[in-house]
């Protein structure tokens, strides 16, 4: 059984005996316990279980105790460490020197003991040794007897822990390519060096003929298929057929295609994570799957010119429910765009919520909207907006039909209600695919995302000579007047899901205008997640040594390892590039 990755908590202490160390033991260990309690009571793994912490077997005052802690952490699947102390300790003697996991140090801001002095000293040692560490120091002085964690310290501890857990959850998993390069899209030219060196992941690949082989040979659960077919007939609405008359398929052929795409979903899922039921049916090899945390399906053109497209499979894999009930989502990229798949994965691991995969299709200026519709944009939309749309791989949770405190949200599966599932299905239909583009047919997904949701759009790009770079745009979904929506939506493919998105502007750089956001976006796709998580993404990127080339996160929310400041404090973007380039990938 694979263990969850854990956070290791290291209480370090002044090693001087005969009074000094003894007087600090309880306070120091209590700091460790309070951090562990904070993390375990606040954060959850993607399966909904509380995050686990491991505390060192004793306080750490000298090298043998640091070594004992290191050994315990190795056995306990610790993916990151947090060192805590209220006092002076011996810097390089007590530090954790593991170079391939993130580290953070919280130095208590008090006057009785110099916790801040240790923090500065050990961070200097980390910088000298080339092992980055995040420094955490409360803004306000606390009393020595104060056991509470200040709010600013909590925020940094949790931001660090979320990002660190993401690195641990990715390590030793796989990206599964189903097919190869789709229509020459750069993101579907899968780069194994990137996955191995930056994420600690491996790459697996199957030809798309694996789908037809499993269908032809019955390598799927026939009982589940019958249950799925019944559920789809009762719950999934087939949408309007927009095809011209000579391309409309017969009712009999559409019914066959529904059966086909349901099997595609089952096979795609089984390829990713396996299915013990297949072993019972005599298919032991296929039952184990590919240990894939994220996958992509090429589809176009070789598959979709002949077979039904992958939209239904992609949509329901990314969605938090199916005929088996409510469950955690899979992370699945259309067109095998591995870089957008990784963008979705970053978002998912930081939020435990499903993702919208979309083309960054169109920038609508206020002037263009006025000319086409007669409508004057206002509010969040006043500066214009982006049309996000793609036929597949867009979670049904993207409808915004789930709610929290009366507002539309996308939330973890363990919070999802059956009534919200039904609302998502009611507000979605599945039109027959546009056969001018998808000659083999299939079914696309059509819905409109509710407005006023805070969201973050993300894209990872590969730059020759530099490596991966990340771009982040926080903003809000929009709800346009119905007639305006239909006028704009019908100018593209009305059979696809639409999200109207207004990025938050800052007045500088790539965020001077919505046009500049569109113009600086690095690829044709984006990964959209619920919430403003740009600060968490920046922290995660720094752990992986991926520079951020574009973001609209307030400077006070940026949290990177302390040695980033030694690369410069005025131009943070350039300092980020230099730090990442010098330190190199986390797993190299």
From Swiss-Prot:
Q: Matching InterPro entries, A to Z?
A: Fuc/Ara_isomerase_C (IPR004216), Fuc_iso_dom3_sf (IPR038393), Fuc_isomerase_C (IPR015888), Fucose_iso_dom1_sf (IPR038391), Fucose_iso_N1 (IPR012888), Fucose_isomerase (IPR005763), Fucose_isomerase_dom2_sf (IPR038392), Fucose_isomerase_N/cen_sf (IPR009015)
Q: Which reaction does it catalyse?
A: L-fucose = L-fuculose
Write down any Gene Ontology CC term.
cytoplasm
Q: Does the keyword Metal-binding apply?
A: yes
Record protein name field: L-fucose isomerase
Native species: Streptococcus pneumoniae (strain Hungary19A-6)
Chief location of this protein within or outside the cell = cytoplasm
The pathway noted for it is: Carbohydrate degradation; L-fucose degradation; L-lactaldehyde and glycerone phosphate from L-fucose: step 1/3
Q: Which GO terms describe its biological process?
A: D-arabinose catabolic process; L-fucose catabolic process
Q: Which family does it belong to?
A: Belongs to the L-fucose isomerase family.
Q: Which residues form the active site?
A: 335 (proton acceptor), 359 (proton acceptor)
Report a single Gene Ontology molecular function: arabinose isomerase activity
Keywords, alphabetical: Carbohydrate metabolism, Cytoplasm, Fucose metabolism, Isomerase, Manganese, Metal-binding
Compartment(s) of residence: Cytoplasm
Q: Name its co-factor(s).
A: Mn(2+)
The entry's function note states: Converts the aldose L-fucose into the corresponding ketose L-fuculose.
- Do the record's keywords include Metal-binding? yes
Indicate which residues the UniProt annotation says bind Mn(2+): 335, 359, 525
């Amino acid at each position: 059984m694979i263990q969850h990755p854990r956070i290791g908590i290291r209480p370090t202490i002044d090693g001087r005996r005969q009074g000094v160390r003894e007087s600090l033991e309880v306070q120091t260990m209590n700091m460790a316990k309070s951090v562990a309690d904070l993390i375990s009571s606040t954060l959850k793994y993607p399966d909904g279980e509380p995050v686990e912490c491991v505390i060192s077997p004793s306080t750490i005052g000298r090298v043998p105790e640091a070594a004992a802690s290191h050994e315990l952490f190795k056995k306990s699947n610790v993916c990151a460490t947090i060192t805590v102390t209220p006092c002076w300790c011996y810097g390089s003697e007590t530090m954790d020197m593991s170079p391939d996991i993130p580290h953070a140090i919280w130095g208590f801001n008090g006057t009785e003991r110099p916790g801040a002095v240790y923090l500065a000293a050990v961070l200097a040692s980390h910088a000298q040794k080339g092992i980055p560490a995040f420094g955490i120091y409360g803004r306000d002085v606390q009393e020595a007897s104060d056991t509470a964690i200040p709010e600013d310290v909590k925020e940094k501890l949790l931001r660090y822990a979320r990002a660190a857990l993401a690195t641990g959850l990715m390590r030793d998993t796989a990206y599964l390519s189903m097919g190869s390069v789709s229509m020459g899209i750069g993101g579907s030219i899968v780069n194994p060096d990137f996955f191995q060196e930056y994420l600690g992941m491996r790459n697996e690949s199957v030809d798309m003929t694996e789908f037809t082989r499993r269908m032809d040979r019955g390598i799927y659960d026939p009982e589940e298929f019958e249950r799925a077919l019944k559920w789809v007939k009762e719950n999934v609405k087939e949408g309007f057929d927009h095809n011209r008359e000579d391309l409309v398929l017969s009712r009999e052929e559409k019914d066959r295609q529904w059966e086909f795409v349901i099997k595609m979903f089952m096979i795609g899922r089984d390829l990713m994570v396996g299915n013990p039921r297949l072993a019972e049916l005599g298919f032991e090899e296929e039952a184990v799957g590919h240990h894939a945390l994220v996958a992509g399906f090429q589809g176009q053109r070789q598959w979709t010119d002949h077979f039904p497209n992958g939209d239904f499979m992609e949509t329901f894999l990314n969605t938090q429910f199916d005929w088996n009930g409510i469950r955690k989502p899979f992370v699945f990229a259309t067109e095998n765009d591995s870089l957008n798949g990784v963008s979705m994965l970053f978002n998912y691991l930081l939020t435990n919520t499903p993702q919208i995969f979309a083309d960054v299709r169109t920038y609508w200026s206020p002037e263009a909207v006025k000319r086409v519709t007669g409508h004057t944009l206002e509010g969040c939309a006043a500066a214009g907006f982006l049309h996000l749309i793609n036929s597949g791989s867009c979670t049904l949770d993207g409808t915004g039909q789930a709610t929290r405190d009366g507002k539309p949200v996308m939330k973890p599966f363990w919070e999802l209600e059956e009534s919200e599932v039904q609302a998502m299905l009611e507000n979605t239909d599945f039109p027959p695919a546009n056969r001018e583009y998808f000659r083999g047919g299939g079914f696309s997904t059509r819905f409109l995302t509710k407005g006023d949701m805070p969201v973050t759009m993300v894209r990872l790009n590969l730059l020759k000579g530099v490596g991966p770079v990340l771009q982040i745009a926080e903003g809000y979904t929009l709800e346009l007047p119905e007639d305006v929506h239909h006028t704009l939506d019908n100018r593209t493919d009305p059979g696809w899901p639409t999200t109207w998105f207004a990025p938050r502007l800052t007045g500088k750089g790539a965020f001077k205008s919505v046009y500049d956001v569109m113009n600086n976006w690095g690829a044709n796709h984006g990964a959209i997640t619920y919430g403003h998580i740009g600060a968490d993404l920046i922290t995660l990127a720094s752990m992986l040594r991926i520079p951020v080339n574009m973001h609209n996160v307030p400077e006070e929310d940026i949290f990177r390892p302390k040695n980033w400041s030694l690369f410069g404090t005025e131009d943070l973007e350039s300092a980020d590039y230099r730090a990442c380039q010098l330190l190199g990938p986390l797993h190299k």
